[in-house]
């Protein structure tokens, strides 16, 4: 079975939007509800997409197990968005901070505590976060919903898009396909993180990923 090139699927949509924008003097871009996992991952995604969409970043990450870590990451997200808006990189970017509810993550993770990073627990975590994104995107009348998660080389972009497309059908709102790591997207995010001096964590967020990462460092 042929694999879907989600970057090319995204480019088709963006090219159509660009043509519409060039053809209309009073063009108003579509509204995108973009789930963001963290500022570093969002840096390239926002730079790339803010020329085509009115973006509202949805910061919803109940997988972050430690409240101090959560506060640090959400503060960096807000700081990056403020910097981008000040520089007028594209259309203005807004942000909605979701509830910090790690208990929902732990309830979801029951029975999957020993899954390796990148396994079924992670897939259930993607669904948890994207489900809330789709729900609020539909309620808010957005034109699309999406996530920054596909920028990571450690994340399964095909699985993320599969979940997003399923939720699109369930909630009746278009999913914006992506594989942001393509076309040097991940490399660009590292450069932007350095440029804006963003805090760049070395684990995804949950206590399980933190423990696995610490074990890797010890055994290196």
Task: Indicate where each model-derived feature is located.
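Aromatic pocket-lining residues of Rossmann-like dinucleotide-binding sites
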Residues: 49
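Nucleotide-activated chemistry modules centered on ATP-dependent adenylation/adenylyltransferase
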Residues: 1-44, 52-220
């Amino acid at each position: 079975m042929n694999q879907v090139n989600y970057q090319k699927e995204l480019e088709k949509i963006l090219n159509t939007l660009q043509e519409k924008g060039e053809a209309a003097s009073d063009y108003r871009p579509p509204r995108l509800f973009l789930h963001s996992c963290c500022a570093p991952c969002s840096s390239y995604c926002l730079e790339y997409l803010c020329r085509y969409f009115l973006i509202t970043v949805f910061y919803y990450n109940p997988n972050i197990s430690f409240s101090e870590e959560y506060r640090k990451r959400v503060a960096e997200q807000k700081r990056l968005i403020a910097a981008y808006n000040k520089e007028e990189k594209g259309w203005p970017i807004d942000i909605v901070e979701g509830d910090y509810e790690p208990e929902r993550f732990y309830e979801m993770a029951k029975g999957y505590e020993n899954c390796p990073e990148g396994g079924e627990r992670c897939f259930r975590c993607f669904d948890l976060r994207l489900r809330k994104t789709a729900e609020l995107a539909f309620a808010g009348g957005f034109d699309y919903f999406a996530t920054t998660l596909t920028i990571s080389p450690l994340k399964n972009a095909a699985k993320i898009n599969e979940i997003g497309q399923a939720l699109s059908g369930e909630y009746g709102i278009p999913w914006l396909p992506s594989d942001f790591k393509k076309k040097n997207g991940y490399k660009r995010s590292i450069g932007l993180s350095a440029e804006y001096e963003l805090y760049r964590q070395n684990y995804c967020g949950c206590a399980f990923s933190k423990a696995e990462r610490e074990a890797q460092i010890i055994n290196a």
